[in-house]
Amino acid sequence: MNIPHGLKNENEMPETLLALDIGTEYIKAVIAERQEGDNLIIRGVGKEHQAMGNMYAGAIADIPAVISACEKALSRAENMAGVVARTCSVGIAGELIKGNTKTVRYRRKDGNKPISDQEMQLIIKRVQDKAEEQAREEVALETDNPDVEVRLINSAIVSLSIDGYKVSNPIGFKGSELVLQFYTAFAPLVHISAIEKVCAELNLDLVAVAVEPFAVCRACLGNNLDSNLSAIVMDIGGGTTDIAVVDNGGVEGTKMFGIGGRSFTHQVASRVGLDFDTAELVKIQYSGLLSNDLHTLKTLTVSDAERMNEVQNILNVPDRMKKVEKAIADNTEVWVSGVGLALSDFSLLEALPNKILLCGGGAGLSTLQEALATSDWYEELPFARRPVIHLLDDVDIPDIQNATEIDLDYSYITAFGLLRVTVDTLNSEEEDTGLRAKLAKLLQN
């Protein structure tokens, strides 16, 4: 992609970074300027709607179509920022992303010998190899493809202890037994290859591919890797719902299931007898979001006004309104069951965090927030009390400032996290103490 006339190359400006959130419903491009202390200032954003068929279950299904949509989103972000950014991270989601936390006990031959970089690298490599084998077996079973290949995309040390003593960096310590809780996430190689192809065609320097809820956790932590944040993060997209559990600042694991905003739209379309685009507007109008989506338009066209009237007329018909309510209520019940099932897999925790942070385009659906806040879905899970639900906004994200005139709401939080992952990756490449950087709770792929 050539640099448009009037835009400066990133080499001529302060260091600029790009987050590319390739979602099922929208592609979002966010350009940020990296400041001293790794604070970030958002300079440009771009958004482009995805056509049906571009994505499947959170993964790229049509590479040329996704490239075309990315170009449009990038162009808008670059025009707003006045600079072309090439250094980027991209998010990945979907049910075939396998993120788990394992507890490993390692008995050392000589407890009086200080732990070295080389020894820790060997331990981490063994843990990653074992996790990769398990992830490959799971994906092979789900895809009925015994030859499937997977690749490590994210890993993080959740906790470390030596002879029962917790440490943040084991290098130099003596001890006989090292207990390591280690989070790893793997994705099918075909999914990662598609992302790499898109970035290559866009002439982008891809520095990291990150599991999207993992990236959101990074956004919430900001520059403070010693944070004691404990929360459940839910990224509700168009095709999937991606969940991460953070305990005392460490990522316990990630789970995904294939119900997102578009499944609600399909239900409304099927039961009310509408085309997909009209059903989408009916869904968001029902949730009180249509006016929010349209407020970004400087002028309301005749076509926009006609569509709004059409949607309101549908909801004004009692029989149709009941069908809309029933479709959304039934799908919400299934979605909540999926949330409960996903959280039941976090068996390492005695109690789940009491705070649930929502983001992603689907998080704005009021029925989902209401179901989490008022129903009894949580009672069979290890919560100490009813969890508190919070819809994330840009003001909730530390160390990132929005310098644009765009309201960067919950739907942009994943992109914020991808920017933070980019900074982490660049820092780990710049530092000579590679393992020490890894042991700062975040390990890069």
List where the protein language model places each region.
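Nucleotide/phosphate-binding catalytic cleft detector across ATP-hydrolyzing
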Residues: 1-26, 30-88, 92-231, 290-295, ...
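Short loop/turn motifs enriched for small/polar and acidic residues
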Residues: 90-95, 359-361, 392-394
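Conserved phosphate-binding/catalytic loops in two-lobed NTP-binding clefts
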Residues: 113-118, 373-413
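Short, surface-exposed connector motifs at secondary-structure boundaries
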Residues: 177-179, 247-251, 348-355
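Glycine-rich phosphate-binding loops at beta-strand->alpha-helix junctions
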Residues: 187, 288, 351-377
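Acidic, glycine-rich loop-and-beta core segments that form the ion-binding/anion-interacting portion
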Residues: 214, 219-291
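Short beta-alpha connecting loops at secondary-structure transitions
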Residues: 252-253, 266, 323, 399-406
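A short, acidic, amphipathic alpha-helical segment used as a generic capping/interface helix at domain edges
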Residues: 335-347
